Amino acid sequence: MEENMKTISLVYISLSGNTESFVTRLKDYLLSQYEGIEVQKIHIKDLVKEGQDFYEMDNPYVVFLPTYLEGGNGVDNGDVEILTTPVGDFIAYGDNASKCFGVVGSGNRNFNNQYCLTAKQYSQRFGFPVLADFEMRGMLEDIKRVAAIIADLYELEREN
C-alpha cells in the first residue's frame, strides 16, 4: 500500500441485501472517481456471525444503517430498533463513536415517520450527523450524492 493512500471505511449492516448492494456500488464508484484511496467494507453482520470480537477502528468511518423497527408508526409507537442493534454496539465499543463521521440511513418512504428513523436515533445517541439517506437499494444519483459527501469528509481529489 502506498504511504499516501487514504483508507475510506464503510461500516454497515445489511439484512435484505439493499444496504450491501448500495455500499458495494458506492465502493466501486469511489474507486473509479478518486485516486490514492482504498475502500474498506466492514459488514457488522459478518463479524457477529463469525463470532469475531468488536474492535476499535483505526480510521474515521461512515456508518450505513437500514431501518428495521418493531411495528407501529414511528410516532406514538413502533420506534424500537430491531435486528440492527449490533451496529450500535460496534459504534459504542471503545472510542469508535468519536471516529464516526456520521450515518447514512436507508429505508422505505412508504413507512413515513419511520423512514430512516434508526439513523436519526443513532445521530442523537452518539452525537454525529445524519449525512444522507436513500430509499431501498438506492439509485445512481444517491450513490453520486453520498460519494460527494464522503469525498468532502476525507478530502479526496478526483481523478483527471
Question: Language model features by range: what are they?
Answer:
Residues 1-80, 84:
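N-terminal beta1-alpha1-beta2 submodule of the flavodoxin-like/Rossmannoid cofactor-binding fold
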